[in-house]
Amino acid sequence: MSKIQEAIQQMSVEEMQERLAKYMATDKEWAPKPVAIEVRHRDIKDISGTNIYDVIVLKDDDTEEVIKFEDRYSKLIYIYTLLHPKGYQRRSLNKPEKAFPELASLYRAIFMADPERLIAYTAKDFDHMMSMAVSFVRKAIDKMIGCEELTIGNPRQYYGRTVIPAVYNGLEIIIDSQLQSHI
């Protein structure tokens, strides 16, 4: 057995946990820090497909990373919270496109080349997807940046609104100019 293996064998669980915490803290200290979230139009010739916009984390070492969302509703909700940092209000969703016209419009702008194209869904499906999307957003952002630095937390009720802060304090938000009309 090597000296390193012997030293590991002699360590208690507490010592191992302490060393691991120390190494993880050092890694975190040296890791590039996010400085901005950007919603960027893809530079593509054919936009007849889906997923026309990317959500990108820009870091202080001049690198960038695309956030991978589990589904399109998660991306929609996250971009919506960037455009509306106070979150969205859950209303009676008898007719989602009428109750949430800005969400339907933003959905078409992000995912469809034809902004007039209709979205087929029922009110129940829409409500369910929006609820699940909030959870998926938290998971994607946690994986990318880490929850302890975010204020996204659990949705909180504030004067009847479900408030989902977009990003932690000090992070710049850059939105593609074509989506600015959705603010």
Where on the chain are the PLM-derived regions?
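Intrinsically disordered, low-complexity protein-interaction/activation regions
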Residues: M1-I183
